[in-house]
Amino acid sequence: RKIIKGTINNKPVVVFEGRSHFYEGYTNEQVFQNVNKAIELGVTNLIITNAAGGVNLTYKIADLMLITSHIDLMNRKIFQPNIACYHHPSLINILKLAGDNKIKLRRGTYAASSGPAYESKAEILMLRKMGADAIGMSTIPEILYAKKNNINVVGISCITNLLRVSNNGKTEHSEVVEAGLSAYNNFSNLIRTIVTNS
């Protein structure tokens, strides 16, 4: 895993490239290694990002979603859910910053599954009925772990594929990567704006 240190508008930042997933067979310690390294480096504000499937029918490829709640489908329950993760001023401030800077940012509920398979049609319908707006295979354990260690943390999803029961084809990993690249400008502008105003 690569760690990149730099600045954004004279503010020091650390970027972690890549992460470890539970579905790859990694332990808790390995999955939390980026957060632990951030703690070691003295980071107090953490932005955790991911690529996610869009469950909400209004979502489009390359949309960005601020995570304001979650559904934990990982069956691990490492930590007790902490609703305080999603009820602090920084979330409201980020939404305002995005609006003021004309950066399109949705808000929604992220469902975390163990993976690594993409969802079946029945699962898509179930997720929608449960109130999920997006689904992925990471992030929530890291958010809860960071919060447990008193770090201000927010999660942002990039919608890289749309989950529709009418889809005839399967989701290809290359399509997910391509969608992530198409969101680059909007995503980087959002991160830059958040850091500059933090």
Identify the role of each PLM range.
Residues 15-17, 46-50, 66, 105-111, ...:
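General beta-strand structural signal in soluble alpha/beta enzymes
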Residues 44, 133, 152:
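Short acidic/polar active-site loop segments enriched in Thr and Asp
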Residues 164-198:
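His/Asp/Glu-rich mid-to-C-terminal helical/loop segments that flank catalytic regions of hydrolases
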